[in-house]
A protein has these predicted regions:
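Histidine-centered beta-alpha loop that forms part of the nucleotide-sugar donor binding/catalytic region
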Residues: 11, 18, 72-73, 101, ...
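Conserved SAM-binding loop
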Residues: 15, 115, 206
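Structural signal for conserved beta-strand scaffold positions within catalytic alpha/beta enzyme cores
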Residues: 15-17, 98, 192, 229
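Active-site phosphate-binding strand-loop segment of PLP-dependent enzymes
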Residues: 21-108, 114-116, 263
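Short glycine-enriched loop/turn motifs at secondary-structure junctions
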Residues: 106-110, 197-200
């Protein structure tokens, strides 16, 4: 989803290696991928914890780039800057994007999402784009689309938003239970939380060591324990991005993780 919109806008997505512990974009690798054509950095706060936003924002300022946070899996997550200031993910970059798909930590009854920004001009344009480009009804200033949040979804989310902290606390409690149960098991690496970030556990994702993942997946299914692979094929290896030079990337950490991760139920 993160890269689809880039391609739909006829822009070129450029993939960067991830941190082997957090699964988020490796800030140390970003500058190597920047060219004179680069317009924005899009960090994805994967599985429920933040990318290294302080370093990313410094790189963006240095190269005069926008930062668009994909916060779909980390709503409610706290990022701590080196000066001790804490800020919610999705509010650090120029724009923050989140999803209200039912499986998300703050999910609606169907599809939906939201954008966050402190930039009044960006907010003005976004409000027009999501409403057919209208500045006022029937007066279209720019090309837009119908991306308004349905009233039903808004009503449900209005109630659930008040309970978001409780939902996150329950997920953390479940993660602690898993961590205790798996302690000492050398074939399982439990989720790592970087010192600069909170973890809201949208997914509880393990890294397996010398384990037959498909066999484990089958065994769990036979015992009525759902498990999922997020994600079996990394974005740079998807056929849809072949025309963008996807096959030219050398991202060994990403490839290795995609072969070894498995996610267990958490809610």
């Amino acid at each position: 989803a993160t890269t689809e919109v880039i391609a739909l806008l006829r822009l070129k997505p450029v993939f960067v290696e991830v941190d082997p512990k957090t699964f988020c974009i490796d800030a140390d690798e970003i500058e190597k991928a920047i060219t004179e054509k680069t317009k924005a950095i899009i960090p994805v706060h994967l599985y429920g914890q933040s990318a290294e936003m302080e370093a990313i924002m410094e790189i963006a300022r240095k190269h005069n780039l926008f930062v668009i946070e994909d916060n779909a899996q980390a709503i409610g997550c706290d990022y701590t800057f080196s000066n001790g200031v804490r800020q919610k993910t999705g509010t650090i970059g120029h724009i923050g994007c989140t999803s209200f798909f039912p499986s998300k930590n703050l999910g609606g009854y169907g599809d939906g999402g939201a954008l966050f920004t402190n930039d009044e001009e960006l907010a003005r344009r976004i409000k027009m784009i999501v409403n057919h480009g209208q500045k006022e009804r029937y007066y279209h200033e720019i090309v837009g689309c119908n991306s308004r949040l349905d009233t039903l979804q808004a009503a449900i989310l209005d109630i659930k938003l008040k309970k978001l902290d409780d939902y996150i606390a329950a997920r953390k409690k479940a993660a602690d239970y898993y961590n205790t149960a798996f302690a000492g098991n050398k074939k399982i690496n439990t989720p790592y939380t970087a010192p600069y970030t909170d973890h809201v556990f949208h997914q509880y994702t393990l890294i397996l060591e010398d384990v037959n993942r498909s066999g484990l997946n089958k065994y769990l299914a036979e015992h009525q324990v759902p498990s999922m692979i997020y994600y079996p094929v990394p974005a740079h290896r998807q056929n849809m991005f072949a025309s963008f030079g996807g096959g030219d990337y050398h991202l060994p950490v990403t490839d290795r993780l995609s072969e070894r991760v498995i996610s267990l139920p958490i809610h």
